[in-house]
């Protein structure tokens, strides 16, 4: 019964929503879900439509794998129906600047529905988030977390975003990437 229920739930929009998220993240790969498991357990496995038994990790780059995981997560969040906040820790690791931009836009779209907290060291991604939020008329509040070199706990710096000691250099790098 559990396996049938999971198949039914997948049939009621999970796969459609997942592919919609993949499209929003510029992932153009023929992926499909397979339901496996023994009695009492059910697993959802992601695979390629045309290639049996070849795991996506053998074909997709690390950045693409991360984007697939993000698409899967955002699909689960949407189908959950409870509008709870979500937290991301550096969601664009191993991504090129083009993928960072589409992820920023997708997360800003999610911020129209629920609170989205993003921790990142990536100034280019931060710039994409800021621009996407302004364009979508979504409230954006950036903060810098500072930490002294003596091992003491860090603090949220309410006055600096991004932090003044690297702002000029980081914005130059961000603008250069935006022009590419």
Task: Name each region found by the language model.
Residues 62-86:
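GG-anchored amphipathic helix commonly corresponding to the ABC/SMC/Rad50 NBD signature/C-loop
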Residues 85-94:
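Conserved P-loop NTPase "ATPase switch" module shared by AAA+ and STAND
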Residues 22, 68, 119:
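Conserved RecA-like P-loop NTPase ATPase core
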Residues 32, 87, 118-120:
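A structural signal for short, well-ordered beta-strand segments and their strand-loop junctions
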Residues 1-59, 75-82:
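Extended helical coiled-coil dimerization/tether regions that scaffold
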Residues 21-25, 71-73, 77, 94, ...:
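Generic, well-ordered alpha-helical scaffold segments in large soluble proteins
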Residues 94-97, 101:
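Conserved D-loop-proximal element of ABC-family nucleotide-binding domains
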Residues 102-180:
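C-terminal lobe/lid and adjacent interdomain/linker elements of RecA-like ASCE P-loop ATPase modules
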């Amino acid at each position: 019964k559990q396996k049938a229920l999971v198949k039914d739930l997948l049939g009621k929009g999970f796969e459609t929503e997942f592919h919609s998220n993949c499209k929003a993240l510029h992932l153009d790969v023929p992926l499909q879900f397979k339901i496996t498991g023994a009695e009492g357990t059910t697993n959802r496995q992601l695979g390629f439509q045309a290639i049996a038994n070849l795991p996506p990790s053998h074909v997709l780059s690390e950045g693409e794998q991360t984007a697939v995981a993000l698409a899967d997560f955002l699909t689960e969040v949407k189908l959950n129906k409870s509008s709870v906040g979500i937290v991301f820790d550096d969601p664009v690791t191993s991504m090129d600047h083009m993928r960072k931009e589409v992820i920023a836009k997708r997360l800003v779209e999610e911020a129209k529905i629920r609170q989205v907290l993003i921790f990142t060291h990536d100034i280019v991604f931060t710039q994409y988030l800021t621009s996407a939020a302004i364009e979508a008329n979504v409230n954006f509040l950036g903060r810098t977390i500072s930490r002294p070199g003596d091992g003491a706990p860090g603090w949220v710096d309410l006055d600096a975003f991004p932090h003044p000691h690297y702002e000029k250099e980081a914005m130059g790098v961000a603008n250069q990437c935006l022009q590419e």
